[in-house]
């Protein structure tokens, strides 16, 4: 941003940044008006700043002393020529000045006493002891064209001068910091220690230039260990390192050297950054120019350079009359009262410079209308100034967005800005309402415990009800009902519903409001109309079984389309668990047209009431056959409450051959079942097993006859034929010349099976023989055992029944012999083993009673007894 030399004092008009898009690093303020008596009526040639005062020296030899607030304390005319340099002590009580008239004058600001040192030669620089006011030595350094650095001090007999360095050419600049002094002369930079009273070292200029006295030396002490030097187009950083050895001099060294593209008119440190006042010109412009020719100057730039020598910013400063100024006419001085403040001073202007702080950052963001960032930055401030209160910034921010038509964005930021101020929050809602943009703020209304008044939410719901039924329904489900009056919104919704009952969205909204207003029956009928799963939940939660009794089919349809499997099972369970409200006859009648529902109902009913609803046996067969073949077969096997003909018809309909075989078997159509196994299932092994299970000789004959023209079947029969009789029958019927595959293997297996059977029978015979004898003996003993009687001890008694006396106390075991029909003693009974062995009836009967009555075991026992009798 370019400015004219006579522009106003405002920051914007005075400063031009090198990058307009970036936030400035420094802030500027022209304060020339505070010192009008000096800058308007005179031209400044020298200056100094203390914690309390500004000191200005003019080309007319006058010295001005101002307070920081711009009040002129004193004007002193002490010199007859231009004041070249000023230096003030730390207490701001004593001021040293030097002039081209060769005089150095020390002035006491409070007492107005002055001490004059006349060196008879033009002086260029002066430096007063920082602790001049507290030390009795009263030391001041000066130097100039005489080529000497002179230390003037107060001695026992008066003032005395001590030459610290002679024959050094012109002395351009002297700077005193605590116990260190640095001066710049034609020989370079010399560093002196007042503690040791010795020169620590000298740095020669990196290069020699013609007319090098044109370029002012800049000396700035950042600390006792660092000195920053500016000269020509170079910036040097010098390090002073104290020794750990006693009485050893500190060592100085050049730490860094930076060359810039302009002339250094001032340099100092702002924190860890270098602040330099750059005179925009090439060094060669001054070293090669004709002495009488004056170079027109450009606006100087104030540049901030970091520790890695990267330029952070560069701002051109539009000082008054800058085109007629030379590099030595500018001064860059730090403010002793603040490390972040400094001043740029020219003969006719003064600009206050400081680093931008957080408040400046916020103001910059506001100026760029970056309100969101500004508000975030304000929240981090330890103290918020009145002009930057969040409420004010928030108001500006929202009006800024509204002015740009960004209502949605404005509604989005309001919650974060007014979360703790619900009254202001609510006012913004009405602002949106006035501009017909309620929908842009509705999504951001608070819905928790800290919420707005019900009127706000009802107003927005009414707006949506009139313009957007879908969003109205969405808000009803999103917002807690505590935010608004449910009855009020329900009545408004019901009124519109009566006008348009075809709207599913409006129906859902009204059902929701009925439910929230504790009217579940009305809500149920509306949800049922919408085919919503919620109607099933309402039945279960509010016991609306009587209301649902006539709508079973519709409820089943709703549950079948539901996404949740729990809803489907819940519906079937409800119908079964509440049979008093849902009689099975009515349920079956309603859902009869949908076999899937019948299947689910029958399955659920069977779980709770096994072997029930037998009157619907044929209907169960229909649905089980369609949806669950395993359950269909289980039902065929485990129940009898169905028509066999109907079952056979279903099996044929669905081509359930295994089930059809079972049904044909139950119907007595064994031959048809056998043919089904052979012709349809093509399973000769199963056919053989089926014939064995039926134990029907005619079936064997049919199977053998059917297999005679099928060599593969013949071989399979030979391997699994079983009894000798069937095997003989099969072998005898095989047509001569029939070629049988792997016949040898089949015959070998047949013979091996026959041999195994013979061995089995023989083993069983041996086992049963011994067991038969043992059982026969035991049976004989049981049959011949008698009862114990008491008889009198009378020799005339015999063993007749009529002669027994039960009062006799002697116990004598008696056995009644069936053969002789008499009672005998046990010891007189002789068991003849051979007789027992020959008693076939007893052995056979007792063995039969001892064995398990399985069919196969009975057959084997018959075979065993047959073989036994033949032996």
Swiss-Prot record:
PROSITE patterns attached to this UniProt entry: CHCR (PS50236)
Q: Which regions are annotated as WD repeats?
A: 39-76, 78-117, 119-162, 166-204
**A single GO cellular-component term on record:** late endosome
Membrane spanning stretches? none
- The CHCR repeat boundaries are 575-716
Please give the superkingdom of this protein's source.
Eukaryota
- Tell whether Transport is among the UniProt keywords: yes
Keyword list (alphabetical) reads: Protein transport, Repeat, Transport, WD repeat
- Bridged cysteine pairs (disulfide): none
Keyword Kinase among record annotations:
no
Q: Name one GO biological process term.
A: protein targeting to vacuole
Q: Where is the region Disordered?
A: 1-23
What this protein is reported to do is described as: Required for vacuolar assembly and vacuolar traffic.
Name recorded for this polypeptide: Vacuolar protein sorting-associated protein 41
Native organism is Schizosaccharomyces pombe (strain 972 / ATCC 24843) (Fission yeast)
């Amino acid at each position: 941003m370019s400015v004219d030399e006579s522009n106003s004092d405002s920051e914007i008009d005075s400063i031009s940044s090198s990058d307009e898009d970036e936030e400035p690093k420094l802030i500027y303020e022209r304060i020339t008006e505070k010192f009008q008596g000096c800058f308007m009526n005179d031209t400044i040639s020298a200056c100094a700043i203390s914690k309390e005062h500004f000191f200005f020296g003019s080309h007319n030899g006058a010295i001005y002393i101002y307070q920081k607030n711009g009040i002129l304390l004193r004007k002193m005319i002490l010199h007859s020529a231009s004041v070249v340099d000023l230096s003030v002590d730390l207490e701001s009580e004593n001021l040293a000045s030097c002039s081209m008239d060769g005089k150095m004058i020390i002035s006491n600001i409070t007492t107005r006493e002055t001490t004059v040192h006349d060196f008879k030669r033009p002086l260029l620089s002066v430096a007063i002891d920082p602790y001049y006011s507290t030390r009795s030595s009263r030391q001041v350094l000066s130097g100039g064209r005489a080529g000497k650095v002179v230390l003037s001090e107060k001695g026992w007999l008066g003032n005395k001068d001590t030459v610290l360095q002679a024959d050094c050419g012109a002395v351009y600049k002297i700077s005193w910091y605590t116990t260190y002094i640095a001066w710049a002369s034609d020989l370079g930079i010399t560093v002196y220690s007042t503690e040791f009273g010795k020169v620590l070292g000298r740095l020669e200029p990196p290069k020699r230039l013609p007319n090098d006295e044109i370029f002012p030396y800049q000396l700035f002490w950042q600390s006792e260990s660092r000195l920053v030097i500016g000269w020509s187009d170079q910036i040097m950083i010098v390090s002073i390192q104290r020794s750990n050895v006693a009485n050893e001099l500190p060592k100085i060294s050049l730490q860094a050297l930076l060359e810039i593209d302009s002339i250094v008119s001032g340099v100092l440190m702002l924190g860890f950054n270098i602040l330099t006042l750059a005179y925009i010109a090439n060094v060669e412009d001054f070293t090669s120019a004709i002495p009488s020719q004056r170079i027109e100057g450009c606006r100087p730039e104030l540049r901030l350079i970091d520790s890695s020598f990267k330029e952070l910013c560069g701002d051109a400063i539009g000082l008054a009359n800058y085109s007629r100024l030379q590099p030595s006419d500018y001064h860059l001085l730090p403010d002793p009262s603040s490390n972040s403040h400094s001043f740029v001073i020219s003969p006719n202007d003064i600009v206050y410079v400081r680093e931008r702080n957080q408040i400046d950052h916020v103001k910059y963001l506001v100026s760029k209308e970056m309100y969101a960032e500004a508000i975030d930055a304000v929240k981090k401030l330890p103290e918020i100034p009145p002009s930057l209160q969040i409420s004010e910034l928030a108001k500006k921010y929202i009006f800024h967005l509204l002015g740009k038509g960004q209502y949605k964005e404005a509604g989005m930021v309001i919650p974060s800005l007014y979360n703790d101020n619900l009254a202001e929050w609510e006012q913004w809602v009405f602002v949106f309402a006035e501009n017909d943009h309620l929908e842009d703020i509705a999504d951001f209304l608070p819905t928790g415990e800290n919420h707005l008044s019900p009127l706000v939410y009802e107003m927005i719901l009414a707006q949506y009800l009139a313009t957007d039924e879908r969003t109205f329904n969405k808000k009803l489900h999103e917002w807690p009902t505590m935010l608004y009056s449910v009855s009020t919104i329900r009545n408004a919704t019901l009124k519109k519903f009566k006008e348009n009952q075809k709207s599913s969205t409006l129906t859902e909204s009204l059902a929701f409001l009925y439910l929230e207003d504790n009217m579940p029956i009305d809500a149920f009928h509306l949800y049922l109309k919408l085919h919503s799963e919620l109607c099933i939940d309402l039945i279960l939660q509010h016991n609306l079984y009587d209301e649902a009794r006539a709508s079973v089919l519709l409820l089943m349809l709703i549950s079948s389309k539901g996404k949740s499997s729990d809803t489907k099972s819940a519906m079937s369970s409800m119908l079964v668990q509440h049979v008093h409200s849902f009689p099975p006859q009515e349920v079956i009648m309603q859902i009869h047209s949908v076999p899937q529902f019948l299947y689910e109902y029958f399955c659920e009913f069977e779980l709770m009431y096994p072997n029930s609803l037998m009157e619907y046996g044929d209907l169960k067969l229909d649905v089980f056959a369609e949806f669950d073949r395993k359950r269909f077969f289980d039902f065929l096997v485990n129940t009898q409450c169905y028509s066999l003909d109907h079952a056979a018809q279903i099996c044929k309909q669905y081509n359930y051959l295994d089930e059809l075989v079972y049904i044909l078997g139950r119907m007595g159509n064994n031959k048809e079942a056998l043919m089904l196994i052979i012709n349809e299932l093509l399973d000769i092994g199963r056919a053989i097993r089926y014939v064995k299970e039926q134990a029907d000789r005619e079936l064997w004959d049919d199977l053998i006859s059917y297999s005679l023209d099928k060599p593969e079947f013949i071989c399979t029969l030979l391997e699994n034929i079983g009894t000798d009789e069937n095997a003989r029958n099969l072998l005898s019927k095989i047509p001569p010349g029939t070629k049988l595959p792997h016949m040898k293997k089949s015959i070998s297996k047949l013979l091996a099976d026959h041999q195994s059977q013979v061995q089995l029978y023989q083993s069983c015979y041996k086992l049963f023989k011994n067991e038969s004898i043992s059982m026969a003996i035991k049976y004989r003993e049981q049959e011949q055992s008698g009862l114990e009687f008491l008889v009198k001890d009378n020799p005339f008694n015999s063993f007749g029944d009529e002669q027994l006396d039960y009062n006799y106390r002697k116990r004598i075991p008696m056995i009644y012999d069936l053969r002789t029909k008499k009672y005998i003693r046990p010891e007189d009974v002789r068991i003849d083993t051979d007789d027992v062995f020959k008693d076939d009836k007893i052995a056979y009967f007792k063995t039969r009673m001892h064995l398990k009555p399985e069919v196969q075991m009975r057959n084997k026992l018959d075979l065993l007894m047959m073989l036994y009798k033949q032996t």
